Amino acid sequence: MTDIINKLQAFADANPQSIAVRHTTDELTYQQLMDESSKLAHRLQGSKKPMILFGHMSPYMIVGMIGAIKAGCGYVPVDTSIPEDRIKMIINKVQPEFVFNTTDESFESLEGEVFTIEDIKTSQDPVIFDSQIKDNDTVYTIFTSGSTGEPKGVQIEYASLVQFTEWMLELNKSGNEQQWLNQAPFSFDLSVMAIYPCLASGGTLNLVDKNMINKPKLLNEMLTATPINIWVSTPSFMEMCLLLPTLNEEQYGSLNEFFFCGEILPHRAAKALVNRFPSATIYNTYGPTEATVAVTSIQITQEILDQYPTLPVGVERPGARLSTTDEGELVIEGQSVSLGYLKNDQKTAEVFNFDDGIRTYHTGDKAKFENGQWFIQGRIDFQIKLNGYRMELEEIETQLRQSEFVKEAIVVPVYKNDKVIHLIGAIVPTTEVTDNAEMTKNIKNDLKSRLPEYMIPRKFEWMEQLPLTSNGKIDRKKIAEVING
């Protein structure tokens, strides 16, 4: 495996003025990225705890990542948009020695020695630093939601990141020194899919401003100003962008590669993208945070669309061996698997196994292997029981999306006394709803040919678009709040 830091330094030495990172009007060249990260690494040197990387989309967040990797301590990205109580939970769990605050704000909850961008810019520390990171060191820890309300810190090993990056570069058909687009916040591991493959191939990482997440017109302006070659995002974010009629190959001929991860890629969205960008390479990938971003991939073509009404997630990558339990739960084994949850032995023991030096992770996803392809069939914890029948909400959503009247759909269970009493479908219709009763009848008639009566939602709520979280995923919680009043 090729060391990522060495690749970055070699490219910076050969192309010092090439742009490494761009966010709106802020840019850093490769030389600046390596110099500034070395100055930060000098300050972190010797630390045995991960550095808290605090902020939002900005080039200096990348400086923080590379600096922490060089120092060998790794980093924990914390987004400023999350609630203060959650920030405190993460800080208390990490107990950091150092915090790199890339914002102009000060936060009382930040503990440890705090560095700012200005501290690094004005530092007299040397701009040369020999990387200290080892293959078995934790390179980053990303906190995900926990069922108890306490976030879980997923620890990823440096060797796992290097292996993932090499795999991404093998998939990449666009070549080196490309313009990459990253939509995901740094606290969401989808960002890893853009950051390291981009920089390891001498590309320019273009960061989508958080204000663009629910405003495709602003993104349109960005794409017009900067010809993007490779787009990394969630399917939900892409679906929102497809509302722009100008998002097509004729308008944006430079866009020749797409990577999707983080959610199921709906057939209709993939079909629209293939139609609009017939020359582009489009990848559907799958993977949990606990297995280093993604463990499978498939190139979506017209042939694949014709063959599969529900898209597969493809075949496993190096470092990931997939299997299922008797109940159909997907299990991942190999180098890609996380080192476990930070300071949470109980939760780690529930889903990880490290016997005989082999790491395995029970994903909680239902899956099947068919015709040489892996298919994700929803979450085990998205199962509900209604009138004695056990069912998968995502199965109902998949069938809804196949209706000619439905563009996007989420199914929300309605509870009474902790019991599901009926289902409501949140629907983005393909046409304006002028007759509520007629549209409801049409959709239900569509479903009756594919689902038993007990799985059909009692009623539907019409939405212009489904709200997204800051990560660009569908915000199920917000939809439920809207529906339940």
From Swiss-Prot:
Binding site residues for ATP: T144, S145, N284, T285, Y286, G287, P288, T289, D365, K473
Reaction(s) the record says it catalyses: holo-[D-alanyl-carrier protein] + D-alanine + ATP = D-alanyl-[D-alanyl-carrier protein] + AMP + diphosphate
Q: Which GO terms describe its cellular component?
A: cytoplasm
GO molecular-function term, one example from the UniProt record: ATP binding
Residues annotated for D-alanine binding in this entry: D189, V293, K473
Stated role? Catalyzes the first step in the D-alanylation of lipoteichoic acid (LTA), the activation of D-alanine and its transfer onto the D-alanyl carrier protein (Dcp) DltC. In an ATP-dependent two-step reaction, forms a high energy D-alanyl-AMP intermediate, followed by transfer of the D-alanyl residue as a thiol ester to the phosphopantheinyl prosthetic group of the Dcp. D-alanylation of LTA plays an important role in modulating the properties of the cell wall in Gram-positive bacteria, influencing the net charge of the cell wall.
Pathway listed:
Cell wall biogenesis; lipoteichoic acid biosynthesis
Q: What is this protein called?
A: D-alanine--D-alanyl carrier protein ligase
What Gene3D superfamilies is this protein classified in? 3.30.300.30, N-terminal domain of ligase-like (3.40.50.12780)
Name the species this protein comes from.
Staphylococcus aureus (strain NCTC 8325 / PS 47)
Which family would the database say this protein is a member of?
Belongs to the ATP-dependent AMP-binding enzyme family. DltA subfamily.
EC numbers: 6.2.1.54
- What are the GO BP annotations of this UniProt entry? lipoteichoic acid biosynthetic process
Top EC class of this enzyme: ligase
User: Which subcellular locations apply to this protein?
Assistant: Cytoplasm
Q: What is its main location?
A: cytoplasm
Task: Note the NCBIfam families from the entry.
Answer: AA-adenyl-dom (TIGR01733), D-ala-DACP-lig (TIGR01734), PRK04813.1 (NF003417)
Instruction: Answer yes or no on keyword Ligase.
Output: yes
